[in-house]
Amino acid sequence: MWSSPGRNLESGRFNITPRYTGTLSNGSVSSSDKVALSQLTIFNVTVADEGEYTCSVDGESASFRVDLGDSNSSGSNSGVIAGVLITLLLLIALIIILICVFWVVWRYRRRGKFDLGSCRELSCSSCSCVPLLAALKGVKLPTRHRENLNKNGTRLRLNERNHIADTNTEIYSVVQKPLKKISKSPPPLPPLTLTETELNELMSIDEKEELSPIQEKPTRRNTGLSTYSQSGTIPKLAKLTKLRKFKMKENPIYQSADELELELELQVDNTLYALPSKPNSTRNSASFTDDLASDPIYSVAINPSMFTKRSSTIGNDDDLHPYGPIYARPIKQKMRQPLNVSVDNIREVKQIGVGQFGAVVLAEMTGLSGSERCVPTKRDPSMLNGVALVAVKKLKPDVSEEVRQSFDKEIKFVSQLQHDSIVQLLAVCTHSKHPFIVMEYMENGDLNQFLQKYQMVDDDSALYSNQIPPSTLLYMAVQIASGMVYLSSLNYVHRDLATRNCLVGSNFRIKISDFGMSRNLYERVYYRVRGRAMLPIRWMATESFYGRFSEKSDAWAYGVTVWEIYTLGKKQPYEELDDQDMIQDAIRGTGRRIMGRPRGVAGCV
């Protein structure tokens, strides 16, 4: 209850700070202990009149005065007067500054120049405003509080705090008791709300026992006082002071470092792991140890007892390593050396293109040993046993030394290519004034011209000579993919993959070649840059337009090549765009135009 001398007021609800609950009751004022009242939070208090009020909780109380005043009180009038006074002082300071400025300008117009005396006088005049500004600093502007009115048009003022007197709105405010001396130390924490049974269990813990971590139990929060508040005594928590110190126990599975044995005995049951004698290879003999001992990559023969005898970690290198390093000294593979021929072995048929180093011609070659992969021509039946159809790459005359070195590097690289889907280097001629290299050629020509002779059918039944099913086209695409994977494993970038650079043999065998970009037959599919460089822009990825070629750009070109295969070479990629539009669409990056799905493309493509 709220109590006031000579008045009976309505009861009000209140809330005490966490972990302390209670109810208001009438009681006398106690001057010795008023700490708990500083933690009270009272809301929705309804008072009938101003006066002196007392709040009591559990024998502790505090008194304060409540003033009910109009919104148009004398405090607001004093605020208006202070505001007018400040405005007048500001106007006086502004007038003084303006007079000083005009005076200095007049002196300048009269004398025609500024002097130190004028500046000194202006500074002294301006400093006269300093006292006025200092006076303004000491004036407190009135603070405008929000007018919280009740039904009677009055407001409740409680220790310079505004409290809404309307009980329908819940507003919290802390009631602080007046203290003569403010203490810097924080108020003590309120006790935990525990039941008597929980407290007895907590205080009855045996200090001799090992204390386990205390699990916090959920406590009930009720609006009434707990049993401790009603009894008038506040319990204290038991202090957990005698906790057992943490100490590392001795682990029986470990020993000190000084007692460790330096020898290790392997528990082997005379059986060896079934490891192959070489990586990615199978055993050639019945016994694994036979392969292991006779394998040429080992420097010494290996005895199986080496794996079962007692060994020491401080042994010599021969005991620890019974065989020499496997990868430090690998077996040197014999480099495949191409056959050296002369100009007399070449009989040119026709020119088929112009490559990086010079012209590329189709020729017949006689007396070529080891030409099992070459296809004999049908032009001269009497020379079927000694004539092969080949492609000859010539080096331009009068080239620089740098170009000559690049030509030699290509010979060394291409001579090592050995794959069923890559054309082979057959012979070279490096001692002549006009050096050249001889490459394998297929009797059916390039893939682009080969596909244009056919018509696509949906199934493999009743095929005519000019019909081709989608399964055969997929077989061609798989062969090209196999060859490109092989080139990628050697870090080789083709840069010009297309059906025109793929050759066709018997039974639809496909081999990747690179006979030059500016062939007369396909000159229209290349874009000439500044009259010299020629780029296959319709097969190029976006980054290739900026000079970056990689395995990813070859993958893009492979996708366009597959599109060519399923259109039977009868359509040009992006044929609806001219060269300039093609370049603009490619360098745009995101949102680049994608070609339509051709007929007969399988779901796995």
Swiss-Prot record:
Residues annotated as glycosylated: 26, 44, 72
Gene3D superfamilies per record: Immunoglobulins, Phosphorylase Kinase, domain 1, Transferase(Phosphotransferase) domain 1
Compositionally biased residues, Polar residues: 221-230
Keywords tagged on the record: ATP-binding, Cell membrane, Glycoprotein, Immunoglobulin domain, Kinase, Membrane, Nucleotide-binding, Phosphoprotein, Receptor, Transferase, Transmembrane, Transmembrane helix, Tyrosine-protein kinase
Species of the source: Geodia cydonium
Protein name per UniProt: Class II receptor tyrosine kinase
Catalytic reaction annotation: L-tyrosyl-[protein] + ATP = O-phospho-L-tyrosyl-[protein] + ADP + H(+)
Cell location: Cell membrane
